[in-house]
Amino acid sequence: MIEVGDLEKGMYIKYEGDIYRVVDVNKHFRARGSGLIRTKLKSLSTGLIRDANFASGEKVEEAELSFRKAEYLYNDGENYYFMDLQTYEQYAIPESEVDEAKYYLIENTQVDLVMHDEKPIGINLPTTVVLEVIETEPNFKGDTVSGGGKPAVLQTGLKISVPFFINVGDKIKVDTRTGEYIERA
């Protein structure tokens, strides 16, 4: 059992007889009395997203899952294909389950497959990935003084803000949890 206050986006729980992936968590605390945890849960059996509210201190059951090291191979527009690094077995995961992770997947990226009853139900990304900048504005003299950043599009289609010294063709390290620029690779 896990306390609802410890729920985080991406976790898997068993709730009302179904397994759900936590899509969003909002914690509201009142001046007096207990807090309220509002969640959005995606059912793995139906694919539907539902709202669930919990009182602070409530507990939910963690889903019994296993994890396998795998490598991303390719996608065909509907499914993303991964190869188990121990058995070399290939698994297809629907794009709806890959969700936002698709912006961090390039060929040969190593991930953890999330398995339930020997079937893949999702993926856990590495903390950082290296991606190439394919589109950004050119630098102008004096840009570095203003601070901040400029928009950039990466090879996977991800749009982020990067420092002014980053140019098209540069490889950068991106945090997969926040989607933010970390450093040049």
UniProtKB/Swiss-Prot annotation:
Coiled-coil annotated residue ranges, if any: none
Keyword vocabulary terms for this entry: Cytoplasm, Elongation factor, Protein biosynthesis
Pfam families in the record: EFP, EFP_N, Elong-fact-P_C
Single annotated GO MF: translation elongation factor activity
Main location: cytoplasm
PROSITE patterns: EFP
UniProt-listed SUPFAM superfamilies: Nucleic acid-binding proteins (SSF50249), Translation proteins SH3-like domain (SSF50104)
Pathway where this protein functions: Protein biosynthesis; polypeptide chain elongation
Entry's localization field: Cytoplasm
Highest taxon, organism lineage: Bacteria
Stored HAMAP family: EF_P (MF_00141)
Function of the protein: Involved in peptide bond synthesis. Stimulates efficient translation and peptide-bond synthesis on native or reconstituted 70S ribosomes in vitro. Probably functions indirectly by altering the affinity of the ribosome for aminoacyl-tRNA, thus increasing their reactivity as acceptors for peptidyl transferase.
Name used for this protein in its record: Elongation factor P
